[in-house]
Curated annotation (Swiss-Prot):
Cellular location(s): Cell inner membrane
Molecular function per GO: ATP binding; proton-transporting ATP synthase activity, rotational mechanism
Listed name of the protein: ATP synthase epsilon chain
Keyword Cell inner membrane attributed: yes
Known partners and oligomeric status: F-type ATPases have 2 components, CF(1) - the catalytic core - and CF(0) - the membrane proton channel. CF(1) has five subunits: alpha(3), beta(3), gamma(1), delta(1), epsilon(1). CF(0) has three main subunits: a, b and c.
InterPro entries attached to this UniProt entry: ATP_synth_F1_dsu/esu (IPR001469), ATP_synth_F1_dsu/esu_N (IPR020546), ATP_synth_F1_esu_C (IPR020547), ATPsynth_dsu/esu_N (IPR036771)
Originating species: Geotalea daltonii (strain DSM 22248 / JCM 15807 / FRC-32)
Keyword Membrane: yes
Phylogenetic classification of the source organism: Bacteria, Pseudomonadati, Thermodesulfobacteriota, Desulfuromonadia, Geobacterales
Cited function: Produces ATP from ADP in the presence of a proton gradient across the membrane.
Amino acid sequence: MAEKLKVELVTPYKKVLTEEVDEITATGALGEFGVLPGHAPFLTSLKIGELSYKKDGVISHLALNWGYFEVENDKVTVLVETAEKADEIDLERAKSALGRAEEALKKLNPEDKSFRVYEAALERALIRVQVAGKSGRR
């Protein structure tokens, strides 16, 4: 059994992360899950949420926007629409997006076609604010 997981996280625009890590946690469609070296192979979908990984005792966080997570032979492949590292998130911009989404949802009926769009925007903004708060910035 390997002592590390080889992780590759990719968006349609760039390779965001290539690391060997001790463990990784993500938010799947059915809830949060964790993977350690030696994990059984599996493939799952990801929802808007947080991905965190531990490397040499240091935990790093990313905000993700929908995608897929695959584990096979101690290699983790993460394919997502977008991914932002905690220290790269513009906290003020994320808070502003959160406020805009909240205001839009207050004005819409849940049956309105754009309600789900703003609901997803709210979820993305909320995750970005939460993850940015874990970056260690002051």
